């Protein structure tokens, strides 16, 4: 693509928790903001203050005390299209300050999403925002590209959904994809619950954001859960304190590793699913026996929920225990992995070979929204 921002493609990774958006060819997203739309709880409290009927992203976050916050993307699937349009509008006009009708736009989606979801995305892009061209890419595949590989298995854990996606020579293997509706938001809810057991009360949507911050700053994955529980019970070495916005200081101990342990033991929150180490193993076992070696040696972590300290070592330990004893197992945890989907999109959209892959406005007008299934896979 050209260096000027005039025809550069836009890359927008719509996560359940954060929107990452920017220009193809950049090495990091220009805009990262929460996928939140907030509406005033009480109409007319701020009469004459020029109060808006809705706020998006950081502005919604900063006014969360007077708003009800909603996430239009749940478990990686867009559930509220009106709010989603507001988020896209905010992305183009306020964050990136571009006219969408001048830029091809690459969007991302979770694997195994309903077909109607990507059709509606396509329709809104062409009909509401009038983009000249667009493409929908699978998030985990982009993460793998960002790590410089075309073969491997990606554990992509975000705020709304977690996936194990085996990719061979650049193509996701759909029959072996494992999807787990357990991710960052569930961990935040679980942390709210176990902090309440300690006597701290967090209930509102605004307080949930405080707990999310506690989770991001203080939680970690234990290498051996039982040992860590014993250590926490016998000494205060694992305790950390956190100052709430009102100045009150709370102490958290074993909650620090009990919260992310849920990824390995979903029964903690009453889910009957296998943990992320087992789903990764099951996913590999569904692949052809000849490529398993390549997958074991290329376990790539991606997404914000893989940012816990200790998660790579624990994955290594758990998968080694499941795999054949002679198998070489490698977990790759790139430091920029919370943005690796976006980075992969930036790489893909700026490749010269990709330029013929875009769905153009003309193709859309001829074939309608279903074109997306033929051109994006």
UniProtKB/Swiss-Prot annotation:
The modification Tele-methylhistidine is found at residue 75. The modification N6-methyllysine is found at residue 86. The modification Methionine (R)-sulfoxide is found at residues 46, 49. Pfam families: Actin. It is found in: Cytoplasm, Cytoskeleton. It catalyses: ATP + H2O = ADP + phosphate + H(+). The keyword Phosphoprotein does not apply. Keywords: Acetylation, ATP-binding, Cytoplasm, Cytoskeleton, Hydrolase, Methylation, Muscle protein, Nucleotide-binding, Oxidation. It is an enzyme of class 3 (hydrolase). Actins are highly conserved proteins that are involved in various types of cell motility and are ubiquitously expressed in all eukaryotic cells. In vertebrates 3 main groups of actin isoforms, alpha, beta and gamma have been identified. The alpha actins are found in muscle tissues and are a major constituent of the contractile apparatus. The beta and gamma actins coexist in most cell types as components of the cytoskeleton and as mediators of internal cell motility. PANTHER family: ACTIN. This is Actin, alpha skeletal muscle. The gene is acta1.
């Amino acid at each position: 693509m050209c260096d000027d921002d005039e025809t550069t493609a836009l890359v927008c990774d719509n996560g359940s928790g954060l929107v990452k958006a920017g220009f193809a060819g950049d090495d990091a997203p220009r805009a990262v903001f929460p996928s939140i739309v907030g509406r005033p709880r009480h109409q007319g409290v701020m009469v004459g203050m020029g109060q808006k009927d809705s706020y998006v992203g950081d502005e919604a976050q900063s006014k969360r005390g007077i708003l009800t916050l909603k996430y239009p993307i749940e478990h990686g699937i867009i559930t509220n299209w009106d709010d989603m349009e507001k988020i896209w509008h905010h992305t183009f006009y306020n964050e990136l300050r571009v006219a969408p009708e001048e830029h091809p736009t690459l969007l991302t989606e979770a694997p195994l999403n309903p077909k109607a979801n990507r059709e509606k995305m396509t329709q809104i892009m062409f009909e509401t925002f009038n983009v000249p061209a667009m493409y929908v890419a699978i998030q985990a595949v982009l993460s793998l590209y960002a790590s410089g590989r075309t073969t491997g298995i990606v554990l992509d854990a975000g705020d709304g959904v977690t996936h194990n996606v085996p990719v061979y020579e650049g193509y996701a293997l759909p029959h072996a994809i494992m999807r787990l509706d357990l991710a960052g938001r569930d961990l935040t809810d679980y942390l709210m619950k176990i902090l309440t057991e300690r006597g701290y009360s967090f209930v509102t949507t605004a307080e949930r954001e405080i707990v999310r911050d506690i989770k991001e700053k203080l939680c970690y994955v234990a290498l051996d859960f039982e040992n860590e529980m014993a250590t926490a019970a016998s000494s205060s070495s694992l305790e950390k304190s956190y100052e709430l916005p009102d100045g009150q200081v709370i102490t958290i101990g074993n909650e620090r590793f009990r919260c992310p342990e849920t990824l390995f033991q979903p029964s903690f929150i009453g889910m009957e699913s296998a943990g992320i180490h087992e789903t990764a193993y099951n996913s590999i076992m569904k692949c052809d026996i000849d490529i398993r070696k390549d997958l074991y040696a290329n376990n790539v972590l991606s997404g914000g929920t893989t940012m816990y300290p200790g998660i790579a070592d624990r994955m290594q330990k758990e998968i080694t225990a499941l795999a054949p004893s002679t198998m070489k197992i490698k977990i790759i945890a790139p430091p920029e992995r919370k943005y690796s989907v976006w980075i992969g999109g930036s790489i893909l959209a700026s490749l010269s070979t990709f330029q013929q892959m875009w769905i153009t406005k003309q193709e859309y007008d001829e074939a309608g929204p279903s074109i997306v299934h033929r051109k994006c896979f």
